[in-house]
């Protein structure tokens, strides 16, 4: 089996690429970073530090790389059995034209063996969004062929991969936590279902997408925002602060009550899942900076994301949300000189005031009780 993976960054190498290569799949990375491409093609291997209770070093081997903006990547799409991505939500649209060209070439070459494409991004139904971009880039006469022969498979991914603090300055070395979860929608595949250790198949993907978004992502973001306000440097430092931990755990329990109501998750199992996530945040080997985790606050405060979406669920089911409100207020305070969204957020609040600014970013009603609660919490944090 041959696979092409877009994105040779830390998540690409440390998570999805590693699982594919470990499964014995012939793997090629596609990226724009020439330093990383050259290193992968010179060595055909790299090291992954897997850290949890203990630390182990795994070697991923038998890999190569191509530029994601040249002809090589188009040729590969015409040949491979699987395409995966870990490029970030914004970049999906940029890689779509190359994928479309590759699919046209595949059709022209008469390659009718099934191809499955899986976007492994921190977003809800990312592959469906990628499919939209690809379809827009395809000529009309190729669309029906693509619908017949290409599966666009949505997935939920979960593994904390902080920027590498490698002492060796090796561009390929990466550190990841022991925990990993890659859940894919088995109803969307073309051809036989793949058997890849570490990839779980489900016919109820949205339950798992929201479980991860409402728990890991919600908890991670709130830890970062409250941690930064309290002067902590890392996620571990922040979650070991009892005041912050109480709010983070409370917020995950509030969002969890929505999940239990919506999808019928077992309450005891979900409580254990929350405990596991708190333990992951405490991992002493992961030097995960609160500023990195908190960046892009406008996206994280949008209606479909990790803070507002669970809040909307609590309103739908008339459930408590006081800790989620604390997290939203913390996000409104996020300031970073390195993050354009943080600067835009600050300017918006300065210009319109917190009430109108939050309503604009989140699509919540400016005159609603929840916006009023969030503004009160925001002002109390000043």
From Swiss-Prot:
InterPro entries: 6-PGluconate_DH-like_C_sf (IPR008927), 6PGD_dom2 (IPR013328), Mannitol_1_phos_5_DH (IPR023028), Mannitol_DH (IPR000669), Mannitol_DH_C (IPR013118), Mannitol_DH_CS (IPR023027), Mannitol_DH_N (IPR013131), NAD(P)-bd_dom_sf (IPR036291). It holds the Pfam family Mannitol_dh. Its EC number is 1.1.1.17. GO terms for cellular component: cytosol. It comes from the Bacteria. Keywords: Acetylation, NAD, Oxidoreductase. It catalyses: D-mannitol 1-phosphate + NAD(+) = beta-D-fructose 6-phosphate + NADH + H(+). NAD(+) binds at residues 3-14. GO terms for molecular function: mannitol-1-phosphate 5-dehydrogenase activity. The modification N6-acetyllysine is found at residue 269. The keyword Acetylation applies. GO terms for biological process: mannitol catabolic process. NCBIfam families: PRK02318.1-2 (NF002646), PRK02318.1-3 (NF002647), PRK02318.1-4 (NF002648), PRK02318.2-2 (NF002650), PRK02318.2-5 (NF002652). Monomer. Belongs to the mannitol dehydrogenase family. This is Mannitol-1-phosphate 5-dehydrogenase. It comes from Escherichia coli O157:H7. The lineage of its organism: Bacteria, Pseudomonadati, Pseudomonadota, Gammaproteobacteria, Enterobacterales.
């Amino acid at each position: 089996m041959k696979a092409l993976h877009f994105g040779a960054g830390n998540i690409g190498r440390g998570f999805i690429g590693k699982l594919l290569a470990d499964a014995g799949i012939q793997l090629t990375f596609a990226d724009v970073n020439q330093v990383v491409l050259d290193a992968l093609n010179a060595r055909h291997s790299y090291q992954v530090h897997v850290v949890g209770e203990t630390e182990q070093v795994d070697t991923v081997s038998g890999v190569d790389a191509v530029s994601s903006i040249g002809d090589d990547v188009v040729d590969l799409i015409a040949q491979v059995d699987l395409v995966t991505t870990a490029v970030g939500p914004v970049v999906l649209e940029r890689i779509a034209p190359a994928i479309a060209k590759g699919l046209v070439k595949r059709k022209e070459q008469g390659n009718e063996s099934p191809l499955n494409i899986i976007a492994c991004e921190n977003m809800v139904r990312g592959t469906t969004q990628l499919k939209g971009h690809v379809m827009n880039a395809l000529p009309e006469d190729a669309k029906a062929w693509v619908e017949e022969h290409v599966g666009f498979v949505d997935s939920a991914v979960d593994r904390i991969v902080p920027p590498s603090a490698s002492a060796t300055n090796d561009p390929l070395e990466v550190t990841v936590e022991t925990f990993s979860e890659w859940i894919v929608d088995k109803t969307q595949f073309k051809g036989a279902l793949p058997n890849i250790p570490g990839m779980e198949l489900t016919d109820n993907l949205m339950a798992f997408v929201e479980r991860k978004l409402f728990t890991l992502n919600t908890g991670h973001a709130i830890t970062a925002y409250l941690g930064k306000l309290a002067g902590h440097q890392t996620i571990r430092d922040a979650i070991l602060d009892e005041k912050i931990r109480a709010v983070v755990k409370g917020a995950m329990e509030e969002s969890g009550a929505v999940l239990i109501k919506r999808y019928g998750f077992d309450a005891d199992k979900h409580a254990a899942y929350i405990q596991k996530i708190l333990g992951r945040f405490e991992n002493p080997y992961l030097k995960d900076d609160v500023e990195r985790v908190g960046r892009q606050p406008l996206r994280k405060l949008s209606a479909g994301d990790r803070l507002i979406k669970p809040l909307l669920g609590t309103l739908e089911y008339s459930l408590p949300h006081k800790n989620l409100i604390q997290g939203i207020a913390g996000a409104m305070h996020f300031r970073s000189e390195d993050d354009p969204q943080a600067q835009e957020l600050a300017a918006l609040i300065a210009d319109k005031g917190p009430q109108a600014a939050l309503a604009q970013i989140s699509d919540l009603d400016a005159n609603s009780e929840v916006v009023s609660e969030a503004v009160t919490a925001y002002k109390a944090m000043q």
